Amino acid sequence: XSSLPAASVSLPADSEGGEEEDLQCVCLKTTSGIHPRHISSLEVIGAGLHCPSPQLIATLKTGRKICLDQQNPLYKKIIKRLLKN
């Protein structure tokens, strides 16, 4: 059994008359070359009005936050497992 990093899933709340700046994807660039052992926590932001696809944000053990490419098979598996919970 592989040990997955701590994770949280946040589904966007539909904002009532929220500001237009909020209606965008957090992840404009993604990366797929990060090994899970370098990740201290993961956050999945579900798709919504602000962004058409789910976003996977990893916090590295160095404290840096990066967006992971959810098309990567390894990350897809992680997202699927997280969204099940």
UniProtKB/Swiss-Prot annotation:
Keywords: Chemotaxis, Cytokine, Disulfide bond, Heparin-binding, Phosphoprotein, Secreted
Function, in words: Chemokine released during platelet aggregation that plays a role in different biological processes including hematopoiesis, cell proliferation, differentiation, and activation. Acts via different functional receptors including CCR1, CXCR3A or CXCR3B. Upon interaction with CXCR3A receptor, induces activated T-lymphocytes migration mediated via downstream Ras/extracellular signal-regulated kinase (ERK) signaling. Neutralizes the anticoagulant effect of heparin by binding more strongly to heparin than to the chondroitin-4-sulfate chains of the carrier molecule.
GO cellular component: extracellular space
Residue list for modification Phosphoserine: 41
Pfam families: IL8
One example of a Gene Ontology biological process annotation: leukocyte chemotaxis
SUBUNIT field: Homotetramer. Interacts with TNFAIP6 (via Link domain). Interacts with CCR1. Interacts with CXCR3. Interacts with THBD; this interaction enhances generation of activated protein C.
Molecular function as annotated in GO: chemokine activity; CXCR3 chemokine receptor binding; heparin binding
Organism superkingdom: Eukaryota
SUPFAM superfamilies linked: Interleukin 8-like chemokines
Gene coding for it: PF4
Naturally occurring in which organism (per UniProt): Ovis aries
UniProt binding sites for heparin: 76-82
Disulfide bonds: 25-51, 27-67
Lineage per the UniProt record: Eukaryota, Metazoa, Chordata, Craniata, Vertebrata
Record localization: Secreted
InterPro entries (UniProt xref): Chemokine_b/g/d, Chemokine_CXC, Chemokine_CXC_CS, Chemokine_IL8-like_dom, CXC_Chemokine_domain, Interleukin_8-like_sf
Family as reported in the entry's similarity comment: Belongs to the intercrine alpha (chemokine CxC) family.
Identification of the protein by name: Platelet factor 4
